[in-house]
Amino acid sequence: VISIEDFQRQRFLLREKGSGTREVFNRVVEQAGIHITPVWEAMSTTALVNATINGLGIAVLSHRMILPALQQGLICTVKAEGLSFSRNFHIIYHKDKFLTASAKKFIALCKDYENDYPLPFYNGLY
């Protein structure tokens, strides 16, 4: 766990403005009263992971997107004291519309995936 002071001193490599990941990051740091100016922004998760591996800074990305590099020991994760980065996804559909068999299977697949592959708590920093 790193302190807020150490967190603020990091060189941040972030997703582009408008991405869901960036929006979560901006909201969390803003609510904590922290101002962060990224040293680099990219649309590519792979580019951000590679930049992190090469020591250019720390990135904030989805845990599922970094698993291969994490499992290979190329990167590690850290928690920032008092900050929690999380993001929820929702399947939405019109309440009065007929759901096809394919749509129902897709919804079931999504629910099963979350149940079969739950993520440990992770705040999104590495």
Regions found by a protein language model. Give the residues of each.
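A bilobed periplasmic-binding-protein/Venus flytrap-type ligand-binding module shared by bacterial periplasmic
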Residues: F89-L99
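Alpha-helical segments flanking ligand/cofactor-binding loops in enzyme cores
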Residues: E5, V49-N50, K104
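Structured beta->alpha junctions
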Residues: K17, W40, E81-G82, K95
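Secondary-structure junction motif
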Residues: Q10-A32, L99-A103, I107-A108, E114-L125
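Residues embedded in well-ordered beta-strands
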Residues: R11, I58, C76, H90-I92
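Flexible hinge/capping segments at coil-to-helix
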Residues: V1-F12
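Hydrophobic hinge/microswitch elements
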Residues: E23-T77
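Short secondary-structure boundary/capping segments
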Residues: S3-E5, E30-Q31, L67, E81-L83
